[in-house]
Amino acid sequence: MVQDPYPCEHVVPIEQEPRHRLVIANDFIRAFVIEILPGDRTLCHRHEHDYLMYVIGDGEIVSAPRYGEPGKLTYRNGDCELSSAGLVHVVNNVGTTPFRNVLVELLPAVGELQRGAEPRVIGGDVTVKAIFKGELACVLSLEMHPDGQVETLGEAIFVTLLVDGVRDISWILGRAVLGCDSDRPLRAILFQLGRTH
């Protein structure tokens, strides 16, 4: 008998999977920072809710669902996708670099939020680019130079990025002014949450 290379008899909740680090949890979302080293694999885990995934850096993985065939996936820096609830799988990093991403679970209450308008540049040099727009969330890329500032409205998650991962992640309530706190350009991702007006 051939042994399953991706055993999934024992399934853990995503928050108990050690490569998924829970960084924000509230009534609307749970946000995880994920890092899987080359050759490493996750425990078999369950995604109970729809989720957005933003990829940091290039990566190659095998996603092996509990009931289905393993599939090789290639991601590029900045890829963003929405996945439906219910996936139970093992993820194996078959690439040569760490597979890093930010995963935001959309809890049922997120539908009660009203999404604010897109960020408004209020100073300096800022480029805002939409990379995902859906019914319950919008994901935007922000490139901010040292003098750059943007104003946001509504509930959101602000993620500042480094070349090799996440520098900071924070939950925003209501109006906020975001700026570059460095003498070099800053790359950030903004997850705006809730339904559109």
Predicted features and spans:
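Residue-level "contact hotspot" at macromolecular interaction interfaces
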Residues: 35, 54, 71-74, 171
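Noncatalytic accessory or regulatory domains flanking protease catalytic cores in secreted, cell-surface
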Residues: 88, 176-178
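A short, N-terminal "cap"/entry segment at the start of jelly-roll beta-barrel domains
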Residues: 1-33, 41-43, 63-65, 70-84, ...
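Hydrophobic alpha-helical transmembrane segments of multi-pass integral membrane proteins
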Residues: 44, 179-180
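Short, conserved beta-strand element in jelly-roll/cupin
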Residues: 46-62, 144, 151-167, 171
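Loop/turn positions that initiate beta-strands
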Residues: 78-79, 170, 174-176
